[in-house]
Amino acid sequence: MRTIATYQNQSVLVLGLGKSGVNATKLLLQLGAKVTVNDGQDQEDTPAVAELRALGATVITGSHPVALFEEGFHYLFKNPGIRYDNPMVAEAIKREIPVLTEPELAYEVSEADWVSVTGSNGKTTTTTLIALMLNYQRAQGHAYAAGNIGIPLSEVAQKATAKDTMVTELSSFQLMGTTTVKPKVAVLTNIYEAHLDYHGTRENYVQAKMRIVQNQTASDYFVVNWDLPELRTLSQQTKAQVVPFSRLGTSEEGAYVKDGQLCFKGEVIMPVTDINVPGDHNVENALAALAAAKLMGQSNEAIIEVLTTFTGVKHRMQFVKEFAGRRFYNDSKATNMEATEVALKSFKQPIVLIAGGLDRGFTFEPLTDLLKAHVKAIILYGETKQLLAQTAKEAGIETIEIVDQLTEAVPAAYAASQEGDVILLSPACASWDQFKTFEERGDVYIDAVEQITE
């Protein structure tokens, strides 16, 4: 870990007691900062609060008292999920206090090179693939997957050395609070409509994503999806070397598919059909990952080994089990329509779809044609169930069932299925109407599947 003086004797407010907040607080204390932690929920009796107080932090929970700012903070570090219209964040901005997120702190102390991945969909799978590739028969050091993937960046940054690589998944929420992050390789998987409730406009969302390249120089690399015209235009914003990846053959300058083969800069790597996980989206994830791995000097052998054996990431098109001729899949990470579109295109078998969740004000009309083509029955729950039911009717789906809870949706889906069908949870919505996280939603689905198949 690099020792920096930036926060020595500086007064820092950490907003949010999530994983990233707790770990950032510990690191800031190590760096000599005077830290106050604030969380709106009452967490007085939690182990995290006791631990941070024992380390020397001031912890205030149960409300967001704006009067705290009279203490004169130099920095505010916020949990990525806390919006910029939060009263505490708004007050910091009003007072011209830098509002930062954990990746900023982690990057400042990290000795390791960063390979950073962002995008609307495919981030976690691509991050995981890159880390696996870079760790294959690695002689020195380790590639650590961290960030939005669930492992706090500041925790990993403290132990990573110059021989290591940090493969970091960075969300738009995290990137908004960065000023110095400079990945050796930045990867942009795609950009679709997402998180407009947080960012306000699509333009704000796109520019948050593009902060991943804001500090890159000509010695760095920007791996970008060349099949999306918007991303080709956005690539002009970087000073880094642009390395396209293309499933559709729109470019042969980076990673691409040609004659059924995965290729990199004219070199054939392996057949597309040997990729172990299904779906066109996973071909794109594989291309992005192999480009990053090659740019970091990894061998074709490592890429082939990983892509032919990788079984997927939990909650992302995860195969749960087969029972009575039905195959159950958990795609709880599908928190937007585009992710569900990708899931529907991945199967040739008839699908019984379970969908629904937080209402973010979207229309689901773009799903109509895919529902018509792939879905035989649909089970809906959550805030968006009526909106999705209307779209399903327009798609001509005859079996549409509305329930209150996900636990009711699973037996209903089984009842609507027959041998040879796929039963797929792919909600097309965020989970926060009924669950704290998409992981919790996926776990509830898996438990419900186990209950009806015992």
UniProtKB/Swiss-Prot annotation:
GO molecular function terms attached to this record: ATP binding; UDP-N-acetylmuramoylalanine-D-glutamate ligase activity
Keyword Nucleotide-binding: yes
Pfam families registered for this protein in UniProt: Mur_ligase_C, Mur_ligase_M, MurD-like_N
Keyword Ligase: yes
Compartment list: Cytoplasm
InterPro entries noted in UniProt: Mur-like_cat_sf, Mur_ligase_C, Mur_ligase_C_dom_sf, Mur_ligase_cen, MurD
Keywords: ATP-binding, Cell cycle, Cell division, Cell shape, Cell wall biogenesis/degradation, Cytoplasm, Ligase, Nucleotide-binding, Peptidoglycan synthesis
Pathway field: Cell wall biogenesis; peptidoglycan biosynthesis
Recorded catalytic activity of this chain's protein: UDP-N-acetyl-alpha-D-muramoyl-L-alanine + D-glutamate + ATP = UDP-N-acetyl-alpha-D-muramoyl-L-alanyl-D-glutamate + ADP + phosphate + H(+)
Primary residence: cytoplasm
Leading EC class: ligase
The EC number(s) this enzyme carries: 6.3.2.9
GO CC entries: cytoplasm
Domain of life: Bacteria
A GO biological process held by the record: cell division
Residues the record lists as binding ATP: G119, S120, N121, G122, K123, T124, T125
Sequence similarity: Belongs to the MurCDEF family.
General function of this protein: Cell wall formation. Catalyzes the addition of glutamate to the nucleotide precursor UDP-N-acetylmuramoyl-L-alanine (UMA).
Protein name as annotated: UDP-N-acetylmuramoylalanine--D-glutamate ligase
The species this protein was found in: Latilactobacillus sakei subsp. sakei (strain 23K) (Lactobacillus sakei subsp. sakei)
Source organism phylogeny: Bacteria, Bacillati, Bacillota, Bacilli, Lactobacillales
